[in-house]
């Protein structure tokens, strides 16, 4: 089974949207196997967003993601990455369809409420930044 990482960003947590967003992912048939809340520091943000380090928005991204608490979750399921990315919508909420997380809940391109892994390979790396294997729970979903 494929795994993927979901982060509810500070704007989502501050508006009390973590539960709604997690519920939307479970309704897709994805199984929640890891969950935690944390305050991301600059070191973790730098590791997580390393692929964007050379981009002009990197500093603002790190400032934003470290500005408040986040919810980190790992979901598992068939085509988990693709299902979650489709449910999240386009990066820019203004370009996201209604019915997607960002289309319904996102504020702007920076405060777009969620992050999701963009590939199964990247998901493995991202998950390892936030969770040890022993923190991920294997169970039969009924």
Curated annotation (Swiss-Prot):
Main location: cytoplasm
Any single biological process term in GO: GTP biosynthetic process
Entry-linked HAMAP family: NDP_kinase
Biological classification of the source: Bacteria, Bacillati, Chloroflexota, Dehalococcoidia, Dehalococcoidales
Catalysed reactions, as listed in the record: a 2'-deoxyribonucleoside 5'-diphosphate + ATP = a 2'-deoxyribonucleoside 5'-triphosphate + ADP; a ribonucleoside 5'-diphosphate + ATP = a ribonucleoside 5'-triphosphate + ADP
Xref: SUPFAM superfamilies: Nucleoside diphosphate kinase, NDK
Cofactor(s) the protein needs: Mg(2+)
InterPro entries, alphabetized: NDK-like_dom (IPR034907), NDK-like_dom_sf (IPR036850), Nucleoside_diP_kinase (IPR001564)
EC numbers, comma separated: 2.7.4.6
Pfam families per record: NDK
Gene that this sequence comes from: ndk
Alphabetical list of SMART domains matching this protein: NDK
Keyword annotations: ATP-binding, Cytoplasm, Kinase, Magnesium, Metal-binding, Nucleotide metabolism, Nucleotide-binding, Phosphoprotein, Transferase
Cellular-component GO terms for this entry: cytoplasm
Function noted in UniProt: Major role in the synthesis of nucleoside triphosphates other than ATP. The ATP gamma phosphate is transferred to the NDP beta phosphate via a ping-pong mechanism, using a phosphorylated active-site intermediate.
Name of the protein this chain belongs to: Nucleoside diphosphate kinase
Superkingdom in the source lineage: Bacteria
């Amino acid at each position: 089974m494929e795994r993927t990482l979901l982060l509810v960003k500070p704007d989502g947590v501050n508006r009390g949207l973590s539960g709604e967003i997690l519920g939307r992912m479970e309704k897709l048939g994805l199984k929640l196997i890891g969950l935690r809340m944390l305050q991301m520091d600059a070191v973790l943000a730098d590791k997580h967003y390393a692929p964007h380090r050379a981009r002009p928005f990197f500093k603002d991204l790190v400032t934003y993601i470290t500005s408040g608490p986040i919810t980190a979750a790992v979901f598992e399921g068939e085509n988990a990455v693709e299902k979650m990315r489709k449910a999240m919508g386009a990066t820019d909420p203004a370009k996201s369809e209604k019915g997607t997380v960002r289309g319904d809940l996102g504020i702007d391109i920076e405060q777009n409420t969620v992050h999701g892994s963009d590939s199964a390979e990247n998901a493995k790396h991202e998950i390892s930044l936030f969770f040890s294997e022993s923190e991920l729970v294997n169970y039969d979903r009924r």
